[in-house]
């Protein structure tokens, strides 16, 4: 099966193929993924990079502007680049690889993140037989954020064998825009920082502007960040996981959805749940209309999960979402 489920990830942990600086990481296991957490080591760096054949420790010496100790809370300023070492280490077997993506909250806060590995030639992919540390590049784009050691911004999924590209179904995803209704939120230009450990704490109207269009469309402004929702209701069975793959630029002049993974059980509490879409325009304003295609949801089969699927039982934050901002807002 392409995705390893919770029980199969637990086996990797018991076999010391996933291990951590922390005493236990069992609580970090999701239905078909593992939360990755920040260590205390973090650096503000001059530029993004891909290691290729250069040791990351050498790159840090070349690019580091300052070292930040995350054993206590620290500011990560918007539009600056940071590299944080993660707590987790891997000793993957030769038939298992990993792929990382931002968690839902990370995407909704417009925090651009990418996992980097030693000798890595692309972001977010962990090769078969990889043995070593993991690092996370962090670029807050709309808000300055406050973070601390053990915070999770990303998650990793694991694939077995060569089945990672086997899709069992795919569905086009479009955007929902309704006139005279709150149809989107736009991030405000604000200097106040957001402490990511504070849940249901911040007033949304201080950080977000409600978009209420007069027609079933509106213009997204260049270099602005928006939260919208899909027209389609998504329902992921207990023996499935899904990933939202953004369409190519030929479908629109924007980037959509930073956090594109859906766990088994998502939307199973009712007839389905809309996907929340994170959208940022490129270099020009762009009109977006109700029903406009933005991506494709690819379904993959996994071994069925009998319990601890996505939802209220495992304290999932967005199990009953509609057009929902990050969990830090009330």
Regions found by a protein language model. Give the residues of each.
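DUTPase catalytic domain/fold
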Residues: 1-330
